[in-house]
Amino acid sequence: MTKYALVGDVGGTNARLALCDIASGEISQAKTYSGLDYPSLEAVVRVYLDEHSVSVEDGCIAIACPITGDWVAMTNHTWAFSIAEMKKNLGFSHLEIINDFTAVSMAIPMLKKEHLIQFGGGEPVDGKPIAVYGAGTGLGVAHLVHVDKRWISLPGEGGHVDFAPNSEEEAMILEILRAEIGHVSAERVLSGPGLVNLYRAIVKSDNRLPENLRPKDITERALADNCIDCRRALSLFCVIMGRFGGDLALTMGTFGGVYIAGGIVPRFLEFFKASGFRGGFEDKGRFKDYVHGIPVYLIVHDNPGLLGSGAHLRQTLGHIL
């Protein structure tokens, strides 16, 4: 008889839940709920389990916020809870709450070739560190290493490192944004809101007044090629994405590959392919040759957060991935 576990991927707006076959890792019965419609994450879990008439003992839910102890307070939502209390209330034997990019990193060993698009470099080196990052509402970062037949995710808040400009144009962006918001992290330019910041800074650098545009507006105008400011912003976004990925590669020697997740890049895939992304990735001066062969992959799997939550839980329960 198939034994299932609950897996989840929770962001600031939606909670996506599914079942994971503990033996195979297969994800099924995925459903998305609006976080605004429920008073707590526990309430969403109860609704899901009732709707699917399934009893589970184990669960792993990825959440887009730092996980530093038993108490979890979501960054972009009012939900806050004790992991131990939620586990007890649900009657689970095992419940893990992990960072969303911990889950994405743990999905990488489970991905197939059709889930990936490669951008330059050669073949990944088995046993070497892996980096994963992705722009969405924010900028998530994690690393992954393989030790003693186990995959170990190294989460953190790498999206909040300093934005490090490496051209006159990027330095201008930093100067304008710093005057507005003070500390300028990488996330301030590599995210949905970050794309807006890039557009606004480009327009303001020419002593003009920027329009009140959303990330979607900027992307659409850039792709339609009817707004030079939007096209510059999107082009710069791609280059800075490359620079940041190259920084991750240098920091950990990620010859196992650098992976891009998140919902933004797939929206302008053809533009991204033709952009200065790979040039930015390899623009490392004396260490250009060091990163030249490191492959970069875009993850195009529909639910890497759910897949990775399942992988994390299965490994915790003793399965070898």
UniProtKB/Swiss-Prot annotation:
At which positions is ATP bound? 8-13
In short, the EC number is 2.7.1.2
Q: Name one GO molecular function term.
A: glucokinase activity
Key words of the record: ATP-binding, Cytoplasm, Glycolysis, Kinase, Nucleotide-binding, Transferase
Q: Which CDD domains match?
A: ASKHA_NBD_GLK
- Give the enzyme's main class according to its UniProt record, as a single word: transferase
* GO BP term, example: glycolytic process
Return the HAMAP family for the record: Glucokinase
Q: What is this protein called?
A: Glucokinase
Taxonomic source organism? Salmonella paratyphi C (strain RKS4594)
| Gene name linked to the record | glk
